[in-house]
Amino acid sequence: MHNYLDFEKPISDLEGKIIELKKLATEDESIDTTDEIGRLEVRVREAILEIYSKLNAWQKTQVARHPQRPHFVDYAKTLFQEFTPLAGDRKFSEDAAIQAGLARFRGQPVAVIGQEKGNDTKSRLKHNFGSPRPEGYRKAIRILEMADRFGLPVISLVDTAGAYPGVGAEERGQAEAIARSTEMCLGVKVPLVSVVIGEGGSGGAIAIATGNRVYMLEHSIYSVISPEGAASILWRDSTRAREAATNMKITAEDLKSLGVIDGIISEPLGGAHRDPDSVIAATGDVIANALAEMSSRSGEQLRNERRQKFLNMGRNL
């Protein structure tokens, strides 16, 4: 069953009528609903095009958080072969919010790091709703060290509202773990390609996203804080999240114009959740092209370019 966002009501109404007509035709074969269904399907496409061609920042935030949007596990199943996840940080425990391991990407050995939110109550609790603890970032550091040692390109898929802010996480060095992971991303002498596939929330995202190439899906977001959090701090009113989202410049278009990201990956009409296979394939093509482009660069060159990229970003924004 499709989950509709509040601004998708015209689409919901039309698709609801299509479902009713199909059910009616099934119950009574003498009734021909083909023409009417065809007309309604045209209207659905028109409604989706009209709505999605002018989404505001808050609506894009809702799309980025859509419960049916493809997550890391969906990308991993399709993009990678022989994906072998590694567990634990060898210091405290395992953190399922960050999935990391070794795989083959179109025949090429790679290291993979991603954030997983889960898709039902049980898996969301297991993955802590995609909010990593220090152990997750230290696991990412393990993979980055391994990739650097064996010369494996790194692919990171970002989807988190932010690092977990619990007392236990802070006691175990959350800030230090995020800083070390960011430092390690900047220091490896292999190609690093990052893609924001949903939410890119604050340091929890950038800790695995300081890549040579950083891309965003068309309806993903990337920000220093959630719109609700910003509204609570600025106006002490979380209901002003829509206003905050607009002012924060969190959309892919905003960040491309600011030079924060290198490119935008188009999503199917109506968002990635309407056609996961096509957006996953498109993401794979972009990653493959980026890796091919960087294949002739030396390790020192890759590291220096990456560091300079983020130094320039800080100076120019």
Swiss-Prot record:
The protein's Enzyme Commission number: 2.1.3.15
Location(s) in or outside the cell: Cytoplasm
Alphabetical list of Gene3D superfamilies matching this protein: 2-enoyl-CoA Hydratase, Chain A, domain 1
Pfam family, one: ACCA
GO MF, one annotated term: acetyl-CoA carboxylase activity
Record's GO cellular component terms: acetyl-CoA carboxylase complex
Keywords: ATP-binding, Cytoplasm, Fatty acid biosynthesis, Fatty acid metabolism, Lipid biosynthesis, Lipid metabolism, Nucleotide-binding, Transferase
UniProt similarity note: Belongs to the AccA family.
Subunit structure: Acetyl-CoA carboxylase is a heterohexamer composed of biotin carboxyl carrier protein (AccB), biotin carboxylase (AccC) and two subunits each of ACCase subunit alpha (AccA) and ACCase subunit beta (AccD).
The protein's name: Acetyl-coenzyme A carboxylase carboxyl transferase subunit alpha
Organism: Rhizobium etli (strain CIAT 652)
Lineage: Bacteria, Pseudomonadati, Pseudomonadota, Alphaproteobacteria, Hyphomicrobiales
The encoding gene: accA
